[in-house]
Regions:
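C-terminal catalytic "cap/lid" subdomain
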Residues: 1-148
Length: 148
């Protein structure tokens, strides 16, 4: 995840803080609009790391940028009739992300991260693709799922 963080940081150039945060107990003063974090503790998912990071920094929203733009009612790689969601409440998200967490679990967020996000009422946006991400940042129409 640290290599991915470095690659993502290069995309943001001057918008991102120079440091990649890897220890959420020692967060420096954040002076730029974008902060990149990477894996924190062994056996924690990157989803959970991101939720901790958002809480500690007071982030207004957390963006889950991946190769799948939406949260679906079931795995779209397995089920051709999977339906995407544009918006979900945290109660709805907790129904999708239930069960015990284990590495490689195929849910939009790991269940522990989903519980933490719900507890903190964290806004989370699922997006795919850099152009789509740019549209979201520019307040233009985008494809994705917003959880609040």
């Amino acid at each position: 995840t640290r290599l991915n963080a470095f690659l993502v940081k290069t995309i943001f150039e001057n918008l991102a803080d120079d440091r990649i945060i890897t220890d959420y107990s020692k967060i420096p003063e954040l002076t730029k609009p974008v902060t990149i974090g990477a894996g924190y503790k062994p056996d924690w998912s990157t989803d959970y790391d991101a939720m901790i990071f958002a809480k500690v920094t007071g982030a207004e929203e957390l963006i889950e940028l991946s190769n799948i733009a939406h949260v679906y009612d079931k795995d779209p790689k397995v089920y051709k009739d999977a339906k995407p969601y544009d918006r979900l409440s945290w109660d709805e998200m907790l129904q999708i992300c239930k069960g015990p967490w284990k590495p490689g679990l195929n849910t939009p967020l790991d269940p522990l991260a989903a519980k933490l996000g719900a507890k903190n009422r964290q806004k989370v946006v699922f997006l795919a693709g850099l152009e789509n991400f740019k549209n979201y940042l520019d307040n233009k129409s985008f494809v994705g799922t917003v959880i609040e």
